[in-house]
């Protein structure tokens, strides 16, 4: 039975940790509320916070619930223990992908080195957790990830993975996502700290996301746009020359948030591949502004068109019945294509040309002969 003395600040931390390890979510939440969240970043053994303990829980369901509870209640995501390790570092060592995804969503730093110079990326590579490593390099492929950084022993993440024979980790680091992350870091855009120096620990009073990390409001903005709610991101898309197809079947907020972080499941990918969203020229769905949507599937269309969401935008040189089909990836969802028609302008460029596959779609009506379709090949 819980006694009043168990709710004093010092004993409250112990009570909360015991409730968490016993899987008592309601009791843990009660202790947090009773102490006005004053223990949320208190230290336990080895200087670890409740968040660091939560990422190590063996049960996946309880682990996800407690990690989300602590993060939503304001736990500092980048605090360090006595060995300089963060919650993300501990989660990467154990290969707990669900915890890693939540920590990155709340601005966890994948380059925060511990006292031995090992970053979370290095821990994932050394322990052979290929799925965790692939998620990290995909999520930070545009923001940059210093994959060439060495620990105190002079080893990089790639060398750690290769020395232990972790082929999936080597592939993740040397594949297209790893190369993109390393190239973005090499450009030196918005560098957090000088090379070789560990990132400073975040204090509870000053928890601003790093400039290179995706802040939560920005992720929410992407999620609203992906959820078909329009809003600020939707209006920005109109002005940039890219036309986004509407639809109530776009992912809801929570699922879109995970997609924006690169957390793409096989089930999610299969659901989007299953339905072909085709746009009919001169159909009731067309509004004249490049925003069309229908469930029709073009007879005789190539398999790439029949298995992927398709957007339509007016072709610059075509007649009223011609158009340009485009399947373009959102920069924040690497495996999920966006319903975006590719129009000429600043958005076209080397990336489009390098990944585009032009297909000529002949009649019958309502499609005119010579309608041009451009489908981006999946990056492997």
From Swiss-Prot:
Region spans: Disordered: 181-256, 309-368
InterPro entries attached to this UniProt entry: Ankyrin_rpt, Ankyrin_rpt-contain_sf, Dendritic_Spine_Reg/Scaffold
Keyword presence, Phosphoprotein: yes
The ANK repeat ranges on this chain: 11-40, 46-79, 83-112, 116-145, 153-182
Key word Ribosomal protein present: no
Keyword entries, A-Z: ANK repeat, Phosphoprotein, Repeat
Covalent S-S links between cysteines: none
Protein name per Swiss-Prot or TrEMBL: Ankyrin repeat domain-containing protein 63
Organism: Homo sapiens
Lineage: Eukaryota, Metazoa, Chordata, Craniata, Vertebrata
